[in-house]
Amino acid sequence: MYQHTHHLDNQSILDVRDLQVRYNGNLALENITFHLHSGERVAVVGPNGAGKSTLFKVVAGVLPSSSGEVSIYGSGPRSHICIAYIPQRSQVDWNFPVSVADVVMMGRIAKLGLLGWPHKRDWELVQRALETVHLADLSKRQISQLSGGQQQRMFIARALAQKSELMLMDEPLSGLDAPSQADILSLLDTLKSQGVTVMVATHDLEQAAQYFDRIMLLNHRLIGFGSPDEVLQPAMLIQAYGGRLRKTEDGKNLAIDDSCCGEGETHEHAH
């Protein structure tokens, strides 16, 4: 079971040092080192198969590392209840018979313990979280009946009810229409105002540059980590994307062809 761990004000919320992860003898992540501070909003970008999901799972304590160190406020991920991990929607069984409110209440279970029973205060926090993400009127609906955007907002509500301090979101904008993406990005502003540190895996470099404080460019190793202007440079992008990177016809933009983004879809970044 998770334990409550005291947090010091001057600590980094997340420290990753010399992280390596192997799958069946193959190196998925190599020599990854970075630090995050409270309230930061970080986009994690890189080609399909670069290790973004693997990184999130290791930080969340879902997967073990082969070597290196991951610490949340100075101790391992499994020592904390402040981490919220939101997987890709394709990894969720949406036919599981559970309501929206029940899923959001799961954010309180870590606080209560497996044998704990929700109190009035817990349901009030669930209701408040649902109101924040504009799903209060859908609280009794089965999760299979939600749209893609509503599904992502439900998971954000669960993290809010959990009172998470570090949120890991694996491609939350993928497959959503523009209004739904705008809703999620607006909620990221709400999280930032509450001091929540957010890491978001995304394939959209324009959104990464516009909405995030820092960008992590990943392809099994850490190629760049800094402000959008520092990281979204042609030399670094070529290291990460290789042959997927090309100039657009006007010669002013860099376009990335990435099969995971959809048939024939490209993403551009101006330089």
Regions inferred by a protein language model and the residue ranges of each:
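The feature captures the beta-strand-to-loop junction immediately N-terminal to the Walker
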Residues: V45-P47
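Conserved ABC ATPase "signature" region
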Residues: M105, K120-L138
